[in-house]
Amino acid sequence: MGKYFSDIHASCESQFRGLPHGLADTPEIAACRAEPENYEALLSLADALCWQLRFREAIDALTRAIALAPERIEAYRKRGPKYLDTLQFGAALDDYTRCERADGVSVESRYRIGMAHYMLREYDAAAAAFSDSLALVSRDDDMCVADIYWLVLSLLRAEKNADAHAVLRQHYAPDMYVGHHTAYEKAMRVAAGFAELDEMLSELEAEPEDLQYTMAAYGLMVLLESRGKQARTEALREKILRRDGFWYCFSYLAAYTDAAQAEPD
């Protein structure tokens, strides 16, 4: 996966549960550690650690940077997403909120805050944030379909199915611009009634990329859940969790969190 992260990288369990990852420092990480500790050096160290998906160590580096210059916002911008990637959703929301106060409301700030609320299972708050983001985004921006996807899923989870379908009628079109978010569009195509769920699931079975599979399949999983198909929901979630090649994508994090919530005490 060298396009996005190192081929040698930390596992999801090491980052979700704080287990040893067994990785040696890369030359880039070692070089960053050798630098005198200052704000910029710690941000560079965090970036180098993230290339190996060593997000918990990156959080530590960014927290040390914040201690050196708590008034600066750059480390908070980097730390919030890493908290989300390690299932520390409340901490992610705190950092996202701080950044929005500093930087102003934007498509990205509302989207990130919505994502934190969704992971916390605060679906009404998530829907409000995604709705805000959707109101700001341009129709020719690929974030539009991402907002639609997560807004619809938030509303379905909040048991507001009529509102979810109203969003689809107002904002979704099969020929809308989606950029690289083709997997989100596939799930929304089914939700909007332009494709059959079982046909899309069959198509996904041939998808070679875990990222694309997970993004589309998670949306279909929530759709199945909203239709009362619990056994099929759980079976699809199991398939998603086995496709962990891009484990820090939002849809995988959501599926993993759903599974953890479903486990008996």
Task: State each model region's role.
Residues 31, 64-65, 98-99, 133, ...:
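Canonical positions in the second alpha-helix
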Residues 34, 68, 102, 136-140, ...:
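Structural marker of alpha-solenoid helical repeat scaffolds
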